[in-house]
Amino acid sequence: HHLKQVPVAVERREPVEVVSGDRDLFQVVRSEPTPVQVVYVGRGLAKAETIGPAELANRYGLPEAGAGPGYADLAALRGDPSDGLPGVPGIGEKTAATLISRFGSMEGLLAALDDPQSALAAGIRAKLRAARDYLELAPSVVRVATDAPVRKDRDDTLPAEPADPAALTALQQKWGLGTAVDRLVAALAAHR
């Protein structure tokens, strides 16, 4: 599993929004059994984007069904220098997306590589063959864990007001938080 990330537990009952500036988490995007979207803040909060299966498919040329897992396979093929993944030499993002779209997954692509009758072009086949060891290992590094246990032992709804207004006021004054805390309290009250 992806070594850089804290494992992401995808709740199985309610829609999930993952807020992150790391595109690696695009792989958890899905429609079913429960919707999962990534609120991508990699270019700052003011430019936050909500990425669901349709947006992921449009951005990277992947099929909408399975766009999340397809993104992980695309990343393994094209490489990701920030994660130390070299990718397959000569396979860029567009070719990777085409291969994942055509063969469905890394597993499907490797099966096509092993099948001399498959529709793989000779040049692509040679590049993939040369990187076979990498292709068998990369998915286990790229994929994030989605099965971490999630304890729901507290109410996760936003409070309508601070639990201890006096303590909050003391912290606000001590740290000079002024209007930031006032805006937070107003936002909580408005969210009721």
Predicted regions and their residues:
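Extended two-metal-dependent nuclease catalytic cores across DNA- and RNA-processing enzymes
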Residues: 1-151
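Low-complexity, acidic/Ser/Thr- and charged residue-rich accessory regions of DNA metabolism proteins
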Residues: 130, 140-192
